Structures are given as structure tokens and as C-alpha cells.
């Protein structure tokens, strides 16, 4: 069972070095590390170039966001390698030495019939990372911190998640037009329609975010507010394909988030509301196409 890791990076060199070192220290060897660079600065380029054949370096000509980066990384995995599995992570995701071993072992437990396998994502204080909380099929179930058994999930984030070549061949690539936010949820839900997706609680990674907080348009800093356009547009897009109940629930949730803008004491309320409305209205008509990659393993 062979595994390629895909790391998407943008101007976080110190953290990227830690991620690559952790991958190289994995108790179950990573057969191949693909680093997709969203046109980071010269320091990142020089460092990645200096690694030579320790990695496969894919430098992009422009920053196409996390969604575009993972699209390119998975395409490279499919078209330039013949490895069995692809393991995705951000450039601030530090896997523990046994993280991959637990994913690979769990794949064998289900006879490799899984849509995705995700790790238990923790923050630096060992609490669950709030941006990567697991969502079980049973929406009322909470997975305990000391869980050891695989748990079926609705979806997962790209902070340590593994797919098989077989599944990628069937479902295609992440939607690069998402740019950021929601590409991972849409993609893992697509994968879960092929086989069930699972969380592997014994596979641990550390998501080294500056703060352990969820994204929130009403509370976030002003410099980050414009990116919420993508969040709401993308949520509208995939809610249209989730059935009426989930479509309705998405609209109710978004209406609540918009209302909270006026109850939280943060500045630029109209700018925040503008991003919500612009994202929602654009999302009603947003129809990107799913791309497929050639499968080198098929010849």
C-alpha cells in the first residue's frame, strides 16, 4: 500500500518546514511528498528547490487558493504517480509519527472500501481544532476525545484526509473555482457517495492555527472579511445539491449568521453583510464543472 502526501502552501515557510519534517519522520514511510506552492515568496521557493528529489515540487504561476492547490496536487498524484493513496494536508498541519500508520491500518479494516479517512485534528493544547470538528452521520452524536473506533462521517476537511486512487478516479478533482472554503466539504461528500467516509480517532495531527476559533463573518478581523464571499457562495453551491431539507437548513443558518453581524460589536457591519449577500446571490448561479484527471496507473 503506497501513499503520496500532498501539501498546499502559501508563504508559511517556518511551518511548512515543520510539516515536511514530520512527514519524513512518519513511522510508516510516506512514499512521495508533493508540495504545491501557490506562488509563495522567494524564500519558500529557494527552500523547496533545495530539497531536490526529497519532494515533488509543483510551483504555480499564481495563487489559486487552497481549492486550486489541492486540485493541482491531486491531479499530479493521478497523472504523474502510480501510488495507491493520496493524503492531503495544509501547510500548518503537523502529523504525529503514527498518523499515517493508523490511516493505512484502518483502510485495511474496511477492505479499502472507504470514500475518505480523516484524522482526529487537534489544536496545540490537545483540544479538538474548532475549524475541523468531525460531523458524524448521526448528527446528535459527539465523538469523545478518547475514542478509538472508526466513526462514519458526513464530510471532512483537507486537514489530514486520505483518498484512494480508485475513488479519485471515480469522483474527479476538487472544484478549483471554490478558491477557498468549502472545497473540502463538497469533495468529501462526493467521495462518501462512492463508499462511506470515516474518522480514524487514533490518527492524530496538530493543526497549528494561531487561535482555536471557527470562522465567523461577524467576528473576524476586517482584513479577512472579503474572503467570506467565497464561503457563502460555495455554501450556496453545494447546498443546492444536498436535497431540499439541507438546502433549507443552509439558508436558515446563513440568515442567522447575517443577523448576528448586527448583534456583535465589531466594526464595518455593512461590509460584512455585503459579503454575505454577494456570496449568496452569486452562489445561486455558480455552476463550476468537476474536472477529471488521467489515471497513470491505468496506462
Predicted regions and their residues:
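Non-catalytic, C-terminal membrane-associated alpha-helical segments of glycosyltransferases
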Residues: 244-299
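A short, conserved alpha-helix in the catalytic core of glycosyltransferases
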Residues: 161, 167-172, 177-203
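Short, acidic, metal-binding catalytic loop of nucleotide-sugar glycosyltransferases
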Residues: 21-30
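Short beta-strand-to-loop acidic/aromatic patch adjacent to the donor-nucleotide binding site
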Residues: 82-92
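A conserved acidic beta->alpha catalytic loop
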Residues: 22, 35-46, 62, 93-94
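A recurrent flexible, glycine/aromatic-enriched loop bordering the glycosyltransferase active site
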Residues: 143-163
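Glycine-rich, basic loop-to-helix element that forms the pyrophosphate-binding segment
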Residues: 60-80
Amino acid at each position: 500500500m503506497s501513499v503520496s502526501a500532498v501539501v498546499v502552501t502559501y508563504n508559511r515557510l517556518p511551518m511548512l518546514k515543520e510539516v515536511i519534517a514530520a512527514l519524513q519522520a512518519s513511522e510508516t514511510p510516506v512514499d512521495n511528498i508533493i508540495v504545491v506552492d501557490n506562488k509563495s515568496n522567494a524564500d519558500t521557493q529557494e527552500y523547496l528547490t533545495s530539497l531536490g528529489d526529497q519532494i515533488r515540487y509543483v510551483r504555480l504561476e499564481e495563487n489559486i487558493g487552497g481549492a486550486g492547490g489541492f486540485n493541482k496536487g491531486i491531479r499530479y498524484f493521478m497523472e504523474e504517480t502510480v501510488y495507491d493513496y493520496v493524503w492531503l494536508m495544509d501547510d500548518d498541519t503537523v502529523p504525529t509519527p503514527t498518523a499515517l500508520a493508523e490511516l493505512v491500518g484502518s483502510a485495511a479494516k474496511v477492505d479499502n472500501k472507504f470514500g475518505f479517512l480523516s484524522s482526529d485534528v487537534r489544536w496545540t493544547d490537545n483540544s479538538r481544532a474548532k475549524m475541523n470538528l468531525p460531523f458524524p452521520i448521526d448528527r446528535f452524536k459527539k465523538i469523545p476525545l478518547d475514542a478509538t473506533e472508526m466513526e462514519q462521517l458526513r464530510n471532512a476537511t483537507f486537514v489530514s484526509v486520505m483518498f484512494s486512487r480508485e475513488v479519485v478516479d471515480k469522483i474527479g478533482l476538487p472544484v478549483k473555482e471554490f478558491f477557498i472554503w468549502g472545497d473540502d466539504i463538497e469533495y468529501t461528500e462526493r467521495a462518501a457517495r462512492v463508499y462511506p467516509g470515516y474518522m480514524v480517532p487514533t490518527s492524530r495531527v496538530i493543526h497549528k492555527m494561531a487561535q482555536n476559533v471557527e470562522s465567523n463573518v461577524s467576528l473576524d478581523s476586517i482584513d479577512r472579511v472579503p474572503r467570506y464571499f467565497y464561503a457563502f457562495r460555495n455554501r450556496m453551491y453545494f447546498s443546492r445539491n444536498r436535497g431540499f431539507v439541507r438546502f433549507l437548513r443552509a439558508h436558515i443558518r446563513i440568515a442567522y449568521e447575517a443577523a448576528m453581524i448586527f448583534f456583535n460589536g465589531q466594526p464595518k457591519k455593512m461590509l460584512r453583510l455585503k459579503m454575505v449577500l454577494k456570496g449568496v446571490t452569486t452562489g445561486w448561479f455558480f455552476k463550476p464543472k468537476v474536472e477529471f484527471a488521467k489515471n497513470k496507473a491505468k496506462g
